[in-house]
Amino acid sequence: MSDNDDDFMCDDDEDYGLEYSEDSNSEPDVDLENQYYNSKALKEEEPKAALASFQKVLDLENGEKGEWGFKALKQMIKINFRLCNYDEMMVRYKQLLTYIKSAVTRNHSEKSINSILDYISTSKNMALLQNFYETTLDALRDAKNDRLWFKTNTKLGKLYFDRSDFTKLQKILKQLHQSCQTDDGEDDLKKGTQLLEIYALEIQMYTVQKNNKKLKALYEQSLHIKSAIPHPLIMGVIRECGGKMHLREGEFEKAHTDFFEAFKNYDESGSPRRTTCLKYLVLANMLMKSGINPFDSQEAKPYKNDPEILAMTNLVNSYQNNDINEFETILRQHRSNIMADQFIREHIEDLLRNIRTQVLIKLIRPYKNIAIPFIANALNIEPAEVESLLVSCILDDTIKGRIDQVNQVLQLDKINSSASRYNALEKWSNQIQSLQFAVVQKMA
């Protein structure tokens, strides 16, 4: 967040539709206004002097809380945050919250607190954030501002998620769900946008916990909400988690679709998650053994040479060419870039198995008998790993043959292989005859 983002992304000089009581003919106090702007002029170059000057604004109020005191406190919160004076910042924030009942309009206070929350949320200090959100929620119990309560609770829930404190997160989720229910205890579909925010938070929790049963049910529910106009960032989160769920279940095409949708949503919202999701899209593309390059799409093409993506781009090329040496070289050279992501790391072994299988099939094709150590040398793995790979291929009928463990030889069943090809050709021929018959019947 830039220091130039004045007043937590909200300009103090804007009116915010401030309303003054009809039975009051008084204008805003000129002395207060002048003191406020004199203080504001100091904040960039002399922040400590600005704090003392803003305190004079509060002193001039003489206990009568109003617009200029509220604005002065906002500036004091911001300056203390920049100076890392967190204790003093909290004192000033609690002081500001006493103004929201009567000193400023509901609309003004909501916008201001929203912008303060967004600004403070950039902090990495988890304890500070928790204190900030909980203080806000305490103040809102009396204010009865449902929208601000909801936003603050979702931020607190996200904080608990980032800290992996799922017990506290579940309590927050329960409260959020209750706020979006009808009198019958069902989800109020009229609150679709808020429901999607809750689902997004809950879906992230179940994804990390690898609770696919609950994740699947919630994911399907989220896609059936039609009454919402969700922020693309929320839909990006939901589709990304859906992609992870499908990939773990081996549904690679569904995962590919979800990751692509997540990437587009993140791209639209300007989220840095778009590059991570593009990596997942590439991963799904390779696992589904697609010959189509994922970077051929209009949306993904601009990122093809992105430094963060380049390693995955090269990985796709070597994978599609069944170049196992190049594939392993890229993995070694870009280990920190590729393997740092836990989700990608989970599935790299599957990719290696796929590419080794393709190279293996091509390697053994001319032979009737082939030595396992020879295969191990070609695949650059140990003979024991070759045996494991061969067993899998034989069991799923990718390879027809048997392993002679004593002599360390793979014996291929060429008769069965020929028979399979003959059966496939016969099936193809029968299908052509059926098609020809259908065409003749139609013409007749």
From Swiss-Prot:
The keyword NAD does not apply. Residues 255-417 form the PCI domain. InterPro entries: 26S_Proteasome/COP9_Components (IPR050871), PCI_dom (IPR000717), WH_DNA-bd_sf (IPR036390). One of its GO terms (cellular component) is repressor ecdysone receptor complex. Its main location: cytoplasm. It is found in: Cytoplasm; Nucleus. The keyword Nucleotide-binding does not apply. Expressed during embryonic stages 11-14 in the muscle attachment sites (apodemes); pharynx attachment to the roof of the mouth and in the epidermis of the head for the dorsal and ventral prothoracic pharyngeal muscle attachment. From stage 16 onwards expression is seen in all thoracic and abdominal apodemes. GO terms for biological process: eclosion; female germ-line stem cell population maintenance; germ cell development; germarium-derived cystoblast division; male germ-line cyst encapsulation; negative regulation of DNA-templated transcription; protein deneddylation; protein stabilization. One of its GO terms (molecular function) is transcription corepressor activity. Residues 1-31 are annotated as: Disordered. Keywords: Cytoplasm, Developmental protein, Differentiation, Nucleus, Oogenesis, Signalosome. Belongs to the CSN2 family. Component of the COP9 signalosome complex (CSN), a complex involved in various cellular and developmental processes. The CSN complex is an essential regulator of the ubiquitin (Ubl) conjugation pathway by mediating the deneddylation of the cullin subunits of the SCF-type E3 ligase complexes, leading to decrease the Ubl ligase activity of SCF. The CSN complex plays an essential role in oogenesis and embryogenesis and is required for proper photoreceptor R cell differentiation and promote lamina glial cell migration or axon targeting. Component of the CSN complex, probably composed of CSN1b, alien/CSN2, CSN3, CSN4, CSN5, CSN6, CSN7 and CSN8. Interacts with Rpn6. This is COP9 signalosome complex subunit 2.
